[in-house]
Amino acid sequence: MEFLVKSVRPETLKTATLVLAVGEGRKLGASAKAVDDATGGAISAVLKRGDLAGKVGQTLLLQSLPNLKAERVLLVGAGKERELGDRQYRKLASAVLSTLKGLAGADAALALGDLAVKGRGAHAKARLLVETLADGLYVFDRYKSQKAEPLKLKKLTLLADKADSAAVEQGSKEAQAIANGMALTRDLGNLPPNVCHPTFLGEQAKGLAKEFKSLKVEVLDEKKLRELGMGSFLAVAQGSDQPPRLIILQYNGAKKDQAPHVLVGKGITFDTGGISLKPGLGMDEMKFDMCGAASVFGTFRAVLELQLPINLVGLLACAENMPSGGATRPGDIVTTMSGQTVEILNTDAEGRLVLCDALTYAERFKPQSVIDIATLTGACIVALGSNTSGLMGNNEALVRQLLKAGEFADDRAWQLPLFDEYQEQLDSPFADIANIGGPKAGTITAGCFLSRFAKKYHWAHLDIAGTAWISGGKDKGATGRPVPLLTQYLLERAK
């Protein structure tokens, strides 16, 4: 889809479909009022008949209005004045896209810039709008015999006042990069586990480096992981025929002496639970257990498209967790790269076992910040549901920056505590630390475990177990989160 920004009067624009917003109580914004005047009150007449109440997301298509160059006018409800928030604005945008998909026109122009969205300026409104539209175009039909019909709609133009055009252009540019990153994240998450395994992800990283010459990629194999002393990482993979991989992405958009930000992604390409086997019902969704790594891929794609002036490192800890005669057993003790020993009480708490060695590896980059992203605990879904990611960290400034980024990007997180009292739940009589802390506060104790390996830098942990994918039903699939949050965090660091 091509997105353009133009500063023209809506009533003079030649387009297949002109989109205008109408509020409840027949409220017309400046754009809708200008078109209404040009058509001799045609819009007002329709509204007086009660054909459109103006509730958020309601639509009404008008054909061949007089004195317009637009072939059609699509009216969309914007709700009550001064009550339009981010979610309602996204709902409005989705309703517009749904209608446009069913039309024959190859282009459309959206005159929505005069809508007041609470707490949002021209840049943020454009970003929300374009991101919603672009993400709404996503289709995954790679394995369908009958593909989705090609979309007739090819071009969307955002109409903006001249004073706002630069801000709208920038918002649209950022949104397209974020949406492309989300699409990559969703593609990788939606792939079946017989295709998307650690070696495959290494190949995908090299493919991304071919597309973007500013990206450097290194893939560490099992032999190298053993040389590095990553006993915890290797323990997760030893039950599978698929060898593990640590994928290293490096982008240098700033001076070489500027410390990088590091993103660490959990990449369990299929999680059976290992010897601590999961129930069979719903196990197919454990292909999404690599969505942390997929979100690092997606964030890198967005950063590479935007060519942000930052240095960024990605560490993707990729393995498959399978039961076999050679698999790790409950009760096994392993030595991590840090030298700390871990008693593995539950092989289904494997994400933290690959992440802890990756977090130790991150030390060599002397980072400004390290953020790990993982579908780590079912307890996070119990605590926060599927709307909000869990967030913990050892530096309050970093945590606040991520919370702020999530609010701006409409990809929110919520902070959970890392009090010392929770650390006691991880005590082991046989090793330095146990890999689980009992049934209480499971998300927090998982964060506490990781914190033991992140003491040499500012670190935060995002638990995306509830937000990385939609479970079951017709909308089942990866969401692309938290690419918007992470990209916004990095955009702020690039300023």
Swiss-Prot record:
Q: Show the InterPro entries listed in the entry.
A: Leucine_aapep/pepB (IPR011356), Macro_dom-like (IPR043472), Peptidase_M17_C (IPR000819), Peptidase_M17_leu_NH2_pept (IPR023042), Peptidase_M17_N (IPR008283)
For this protein, what is any one GO molecular function term?
metalloaminopeptidase activity
The residues that hold Mn(2+) 1 are D271, D348, E350
Catalysed reactions listed for this entry: Release of an N-terminal amino acid, Xaa-|-Yaa-, in which Xaa is preferably Leu, but may be other amino acids including Pro although not Arg or Lys, and Yaa may be Pro. Amino acid amides and methyl esters are also readily hydrolyzed, but rates on arylamides are exceedingly low; Release of an N-terminal amino acid, preferentially leucine, but not glutamic or aspartic acids
Active site annotation, chain numbering? K278, R352
Keywords from the named record: Aminopeptidase, Cytoplasm, Hydrolase, Manganese, Metal-binding, Protease
Co-factor requirement: Mn(2+)
EC number, as in UniProt: 3.4.11.1, 3.4.11.10
One GO term (biological process)? proteolysis
Q: Where in the cell is it found?
A: Cytoplasm
Q: How is the cofactor bound?
A: Binds 2 manganese ions per subunit.
Any keyword Kinase? Answer: no
* Main subcellular location of this protein, as a coarse class: cytoplasm
What residues bind Mn(2+) 2, as annotated? K266, D271, D289, E350
Pfam families for this protein: Peptidase_M17 (PF00883), Peptidase_M17_N (PF02789)
Q: List the disulfide bonds.
A: none
Tell me a GO cellular component.
cytoplasm
**HAMAP family in the cross-refs:** Cytosol_peptidase_M17
Q: Which family does it belong to?
A: Belongs to the peptidase M17 family.
Q: Name the PANTHER family for this protein.
A: CYTOSOL AMINOPEPTIDASE, LEUCINE AMINOPEPTIDASE-RELATED
Q: Function of this protein?
A: Presumably involved in the processing and regular turnover of intracellular proteins. Catalyzes the removal of unsubstituted N-terminal amino acids from various peptides.
The name this protein goes by in its record: Probable cytosol aminopeptidase
Q: Which gene encodes it?
A: pepA
